[in-house]
Design a protein with these regions (language model features):
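Bacterial N-terminal signal peptides that target proteins for export
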Residues: 1-10
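A periodicity- and composition-biased signal for non-globular, repetitive helical segments
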Residues: 13-14, 138
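Hydrophobic h-region of N-terminal signal peptides that target proteins for export
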Residues: 15-22
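Flexible, surface-exposed loop/linker segments and immediately adjacent secondary-structure boundaries
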Residues: 23-213
Length: 213
């Protein structure tokens, strides 16, 4: 075989492997209300209307419309993300990292430290929140270039991608990060933590999931 032929075969194999990995089912939609759409990996549009039990594949993006919400559970560690109205983001996983790439909107996270084998991150154009086992919310205003992260339990780090600053956020604390490079920690105030779209606490939901059938 000639070297160009071998190189061509190698490239095809790598692209095939990436495609297979990207198509891996990483989560499922537990609940959905209103307009909830999926943009499958490789697609340019939000073309799939979500149904209960809908598979979420690595690389998929989700859009939750006005007066709508969705709840997604990750299959490996049973971590849960609740997605509030007017939110868009993409699920991206590697062998050691789980990232939610937020374009806009508000998400509530209950990250299960038990059985978790990957780093859990929430990324916006401005900030990166690196999470261990904790419960927190993330809000990104795409127009203003402002993020707000609020801790409810546990702790996590927030990194401002512009300035390189990092702060640790614990329970009852928040961090406001913006496109000017500012990263401001402060005590959380009443109303900072978004209302749960289901009206249930993530702790109660996690306990229900852990109960044997």
């Amino acid at each position: 075989m000639t070297m160009p032929f071998i190189k061509k075969i190698s490239i095809i194999f790598i692209l095939f492997t990436i495609t297979i990995c990207s198509a891996e089912t990483i989560g499922r939609v537990m609940k959905a209300n209103g307009e909830v759409l999926i943009k499958p990996i490789g697609s340019g549009t939000y073309s799939v209307s979500v149904k209960l039990g809908q598979a979420i594949s690595n690389g998929d993006a989700i859009r939750v419309g006005e007066a709508s919400f969705a709840v997604v559970i990750f299959l490996d560690d049973k971590s849960v993300v609740k997605i509030k109205e007017n939110t868009d983001f993409q699920f991206v996983e590697t062998s050691n990292t789980r990232s939610l790439i937020i374009e806009q909107g508000t998400t509530l996270h209950n990250v299960n430290s038990k059985d978790r084998k990957k780093d859990y991150r929430v990324e916006t154009p401005v900030s990166v929140a690196s999470v261990k086992g904790t419960e927190f919310s993330a809000f990104h205003d795409a127009v203003a270039g402002v993020d707000k992260f609020v801790g409810k339990s546990g702790n996590f780090d927030v990194f401002n991608s512009i300035s390189g600053m990092t702060v640790n956020v614990g329970a009852g604390q928040k961090a406001v990060s913006n496109a000017m490079g500012q990263l401001i920690p402060a005590p959380a105030e009443p109303g900072d933590y978004p209302e749960d779209p289901e009206g249930d606490s993530p702790e109660e939901e996690q306990e229900e999931q852990d109960q044997p059938e």
